[in-house]
Amino acid sequence: MQMGESPARLRDGDFIKKLYHARSWAPARYLKYDPIDLAKRSMAPIQRAHTKIVGTTQADNLRSLAAKIWMIEQAQHTVDLVYYIYRHDLAGNAILGALCNAVQRGVDIRIMVDSLGSWSMNHEELKAFETCADNAGYIRDASGRATPFRARIQVVIVNALTSLSSWSNRRSHDKLIIVDGSFPGRDIVMTGGRNISIDYYGIKADGTLNRDSYIDLEILLRSENSTTANELTVGDVSSIYYTLLFLHKGNKRIHPSPYADDEQYGPNTYPQILGRQQRDLAFVKNLPAMKTVFASMPGYFANDFRSSQVRIAHELGNLTAKDTVTNVRETKSRNLNSIGA
């Protein structure tokens, strides 16, 4: 799918084929453009959207985790996530468990984590998670019909410390999840300050309430029903942004180890890791405090949104600029979508 191309211009079969290829990882040497440069030069539009703030209270902390899992469980076509910090604790495992179930029903998944904020020697948990796609279902079109395209899990490390095209002090602090971003009326975007770590979500590892969680907030965005057929939605623009970050030349695509199953016993074999993720998902959903929150999610996503005008701002230029600190004003001015431009 060409950047800026509206889904309404394409028949379902053509659209899914183009979408599948547009969502595919490709090494930088195969690209005809620099994704970060394109992101800086392309002005993001001001758009109409339904918005809701996920606030800073204890109840909001619980609601934020439930919302992420609920969004994934409601996804019909695609899910994209990127987080600076992704901890493989109760919250992180529960989300991966939900994503594993999603790909097996035919939802195409991309996930990015920052190489420093989510530092790991080998990212075994994410590699194990990718094997969920061994039993992936087939992506469905907007009418719900199965297509010939099998759902995937693509895991990318942002500005990998082992990449020759990366800089150790150039980080992605994105916290973003996009569900069905290219499907108007179904798209949901969540962004803000919460990372994927139990410290943000109001519960402790044993499931008891944690009233000392980090204080942060997020915003939910959905496209308006009044969006015209040829108008890009907030889901479209968020997905385009995600793709440009996904294809950044400093990133590294990781894959499961071909010899991972040679170790039959131990806590870190792929089946053991996947089992933990599913158990943690079930544990979170059955916590007394969380069961009530999960039960409220259909109404939460249906009501009390505000009609707003929004624009997706970003600082992707900082991933490649060599004078970010010494020449802040000029660096921001080169990015048409910078908050400080």
Positions of the model-derived regions?
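HKD-type phospholipase D/PLD-like phosphodiesterase module
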Residues: 5-9, 13-15, 19-78, 85-341
